[in-house]
Amino acid sequence: MRTRKPLEDWDRRAFLQLLGVSALGLAVPGWKILAAERAGAKPLRGIFPVAQTPFTESNKLDLDALIEEVRFIDRGGVHGFVWPQMASEWMTLTEAERLEGSEAIASTGRKLRPAIVIGVQGPDVAIAIKYAKHAERVGADAIISLPPSENSDPKTDLEYYKAVGGATQLPLFVQAVGNMGVDLLIEMYKAIPTFRYVKDEAGSPLMSIGPLRQRSSDQLKIFSGSHGRDLIDEMRRGFSGSMPAAPFADLYAQTWDLWHEGKHDEAMAMHGRTLLFITEAVSHGPESLKYILYLRGVFKTYGLRTQRAPGFSSAVKLAAGSDQAETHLDEEGKQALRETLEYLKPYLRA
């Protein structure tokens, strides 16, 4: 079982005050009409990559490259775009960068096909609510949030997601990690009208989807993570989508589209090609994802940030591989990625 990535604790009194406000919101008539149910809403189904965050040579957020990443995803025929989450180095981003980046993504995405999902987790519940309201204001199609803390109990998780889900009418994705099991997710489903989507990275998602669908009368829609390694098995079992990384999302999207067109052999062949990139990414870590975007002309640089944004303690680990961890992209790794990209060029859309 995976360990939950710690965020920060919040002031409980302030949290309960905010929860009271959100509870009032849930009583407003019409609250249960979700954005996804309104005419013209983009479908929340398919390949929704968690985007990498580009930085300039001076380590500033590169908005132009971030906008180009949205366009790159659209050109690849990909179904959605998610930012910022763990793979986006979100704990290194300042509040101003989060707000500015979300607005740029939503504005660009409004004219394109992919649905835009904005990550709203933060060092406390008040800022998470602020991010959620901002996402709704700038026109995002949905929001997603990690849980509040490594050591939070199910009641605290439930209260947190009630507050975040009650802050807007946007559909809410809950990112299930650590020990967030089926019972807690079903309790959330019953208590939070906007919660209808799970990115499941807790325990064994392949084993959880059956009970989640059955106990929610198939109203909870399940997405996967973990680089989409089990995508074929997930589609067989009725997953509604996957949230892999962005650099080769066009390959995942082709796998998804082929499978749902009934071309299962072709889908499995395409997924086999995608696995070439997946193994390289796992071997060489998050910098390799940015390097592929650099090779594909989306990013101008591919370095990672190593400093946390204000509000996060030094005890909080950044993304896997980005905090002086086990993986490193060396020259041999770069050569391997270049050769893999060259081999797969005939299959790339973007």
Report each predicted region and the residues it spans.
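N-terminal secretory signal peptides and thylakoid transit peptides that target proteins
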Residues: 2-23
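C-terminal segment of classical bacterial N-terminal signal peptides
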Residues: 27-32
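Boundary at the C-terminal end of the N-terminal hydrophobic targeting segment
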Residues: 35-36, 41
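Active-site beta->alpha loop and helix N-cap motifs at the rims of alpha/beta catalytic domains
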Residues: 41, 54-55, 60-177
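Structural preference for beta-strand elements that scaffold enzyme active sites
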Residues: 46-48, 80, 115-117, 141-142, ...
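Short helix-capping segments at alpha-helix termini
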Residues: 108-114, 138-139, 168-170, 191-194, ...
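Catalytic alpha/beta core domains of metabolic enzymes, predominantly
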Residues: 178-282
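Structured C-terminal cap/extension of enzyme domains
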Residues: 233-350
